[in-house]
Amino acid sequence: MNQSVIDAVLRGRIPRKIGARRVRALRDSIDFVGLNYYNREFVAFDRHARQAFFGRRVQNPDGEISDKNYGEVYPRGLYRILRRLKRSGKPIYITENGLPDHDDDRRPAFLVNHLKQMWHAINENVPVMGYYHWTLTDNYEWAEGWNLRFGLVELDPKTQRRSLRRSGALYAEVCKANALDTDMVRRYAPELMETVFRG
């Protein structure tokens, strides 16, 4: 199913696995590709999990898991999917990328690592035209309520008071400079200095 929608809107072709047919009106019907990328998950077949399309989540024992077991933090996956989407021939916007991080301890490194992967893709002529972090402020999630904190800006649900987080300050600097530089990484994610800027 991974390529089914993109194949349909680019080529007007619905794959055999979901009922092969051609739909000419769909062919080349998009102006850009919007990518929402959050994490990596492994699944295994489970014949008892009908409601989950017979799949069961399997955790990577070596992976970094985000708050509330939201998924494995895997920045390289962003690069890999951007390279794959390059074949669409369309401009690409990363329309959502983020993780729940109640205390904003990991979000600065998450941002740095994902922006680095986006930069690698751009340097390989992947037409990435924009990046939107998920989210600007903490928001109410349908299944989780206020329990997952995704925002660059902390939101108190009772008072509606907003406070800029460290990750928000980092992202503001990145946007203003249209770059991620050594000073930003040193101040916001110093543990990544040697891996982000090698040599």
Per-region residue spans from a language model:
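Active-site region of glycoside hydrolase catalytic domains
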Residues: 1-199
